[in-house]
């Protein structure tokens, strides 16, 4: 079985070190070359290279029951094998279900089963994300796993303090744009069965009486059908209640590549969505329906400081609000338009401010920020703006599309890596030396950031995740 490693060429930041920016190219790495890869990464360790990654793992872990289901579908094994294949020193996993507790340790045990002699996995599980404006379905955790043989976590992890801010500056002035509405499960509508009347004398009556009987029959059948729908929904809700409370607010993916890159949100298997689908009466969460004037981050970034062979570095991992404006939650269209909602636009616009706070908290300028931003293809510059203090190590181009589409291939470059300018040169330092060990297999060198091509995985990619992992070397 072949795996594909998708890499981005060249240094990031034109003129920073006198090199240009290249584009992604696919390279194939067979399992037979694994021993050669192990040698290469052992050499990397000796040369003090550090490999940091991020991955939206798609509603991962959760309760013991949820973990068992994922394990039976090779999800946990696939994620564990890929993480070990990529030889991360540190990797942050997003969309970790809120009920995750003991299953985090079980997953790390599985990671260690696949580990080489130079790797011993440890982990830090964040608390559940907190927000004054996000829905219950958006809550999740971040799981940071790291190789304790190569790095050491210093102190405790930290959530960005997440202040509420006025959203009016980020909202559209009313110009037309597409909104995002949760997709509802199709319910088959059976035509009412008309009751046949007998031809006996006693059954003969006026046309009015016949019409009344048919009307009553239709009404009865409709009530029965409604009851069947409600019963099925309640059964589904009861059966999946454990999973329902686990799952987070999954963002949508482009349904037609090359169209307008407009995403439709995937159905959330939460109690709230189930009730909507069943059209039953429920008390709606005020956070979902209120007309928002202030917002905070739906899922504030979680960060931690590590001692490495290259010095101390702060890594921060995040997951922005779902793409588009969800009218069910009172969300607004972003001022920038282009299919973005005001909430994720607000998060993009305040990312550099959040990074400032994280640096200040740890008193460390060396920061790597990695997140599933839900900022669509072509929108990076308008969404984030420019900064004199920070640089993107990922680019807004075809090569960096990391979110899998529903039909084929990748749809959007949602997953971003940002670093402080003071740390940028350290990221680029010796990156070429590291990649020299792959010349025989990848036929190129000089890479410092990369994207793993999950679409080439041997099983259905979305069985594992709807995102590919990204990473950077320093």
UniProtKB/Swiss-Prot annotation:
Acidic residues bias spans: 257-266
GO CC annotation terms, alphabetical: membrane
Segments crossing the lipid bilayer: 3-23
Subcellular localization: Membrane
UniProt feature, compositional bias: Basic residues: 180-210
Record field: compositional bias (Basic and acidic residues): 282-296
Region described as Disordered: 171-296
Principal location: membrane
SUPFAM superfamilies: DNase I-like
Topology term for the membrane: Single-pass membrane protein
Alphabetized InterPro entries for the sequence: Endo/exonu/phosph_ase_sf
Stretches with biased composition (Low complexity): 267-281
Record keywords: Membrane, Transmembrane, Transmembrane helix
Polar residues bias (residue ranges): 231-253
Alphabetical list of PANTHER family matching this protein: DEOXYRIBONUCLEASE, EXTRACELLULAR NUCLEASE
Protein known as: Uncharacterized protein MPN_491
């Amino acid at each position: 079985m072949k795996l594909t490693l998708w890499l981005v060429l060249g240094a990031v930041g034109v003129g920073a070190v006198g090199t240009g920016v290249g584009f992604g190219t696919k390279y194939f790495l067979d399992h037979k070359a694994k021993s050669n890869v192990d040698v290469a990464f052992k050499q990397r360790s000796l040369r003090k290279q550090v490999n940091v990654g991020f991955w939206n793992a798609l509603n991962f872990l959760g309760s013991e029951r949820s973990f068992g289901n994922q394990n039976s579908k090779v999800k946990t094994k696939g994620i564990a094998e890929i993480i070990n294949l990529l030889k991360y020193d540190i990797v942050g996993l997003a969309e970790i279900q809120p009920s995750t507790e003991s299953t985090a340790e079980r997953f790390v045990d599985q990671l260690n089963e696949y580990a080489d002699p130079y790797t011993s996995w440890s982990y830090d599980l964040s608390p559940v994300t907190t927000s004054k404006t996000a829905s219950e379905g958006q809550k999740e955790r971040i799981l940071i796993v790291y190789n304790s043989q190569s790095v050491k976590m210093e102190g405790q992890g930290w959530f960005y303090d997440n202040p509420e801010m006025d959203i009016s500056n980020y909202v559209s002035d009313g110009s037309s744009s597409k909104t995002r509405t949760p997709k509802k499960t199709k319910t088959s509508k059976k035509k009412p069965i008309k009751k046949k009347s007998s031809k006996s004398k006693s059954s003969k009556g006026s046309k009015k009486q016949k019409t009344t009987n048919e009307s009553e029959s239709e009404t009865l059948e409709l009530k029965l059908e409604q009851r069947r729908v409600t019963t099925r929904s309640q059964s589904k809700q009861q059966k999946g209640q454990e999973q329902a409370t686990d799952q987070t607010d999954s963002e949508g993916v482009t349904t037609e590549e090359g169209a307008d890159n407009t995403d439709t949100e995937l159905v959330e298997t939460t109690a709230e969505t189930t009730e909507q689908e069943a059209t039953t009466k429920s008390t709606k969460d005020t956070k979902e329906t209120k007309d928002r004037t202030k917002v905070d981050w739906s899922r504030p970034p979680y960060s931690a400081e590590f001692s490495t062979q290259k010095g101390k570095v702060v890594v921060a991992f995040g997951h922005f609000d779902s793409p588009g404006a969800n009218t069910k939650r009172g969300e607004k269209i972003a001022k920038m338009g282009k299919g973005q909602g005001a909430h994720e636009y607000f998060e993009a616009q305040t990312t550099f401010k959040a990074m400032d706070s994280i640096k200040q908290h740890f008193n460390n300028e060396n920061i790597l920020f990695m997140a599933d931003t839900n900022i669509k293809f072509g929108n990076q510059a308008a969404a984030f703006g420019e900064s004199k203090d920070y640089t993107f190590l990922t680019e807004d181009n075809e090569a960096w599309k990391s979110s899998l589409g529903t039909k084929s291939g990748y749809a959007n470059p949602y997953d971003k890596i940002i670093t402080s300018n003071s740390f940028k040169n350290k990221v680029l330092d010796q990156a070429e030396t590291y990649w020299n060990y792959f010349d025989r297999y990848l036929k190129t060198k000089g890479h410092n950031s990369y994207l793993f091509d999950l679409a080439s995985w041997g099983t259905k990619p979305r069985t594992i995740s709807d995102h590919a992992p990204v990473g950077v070397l320093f």
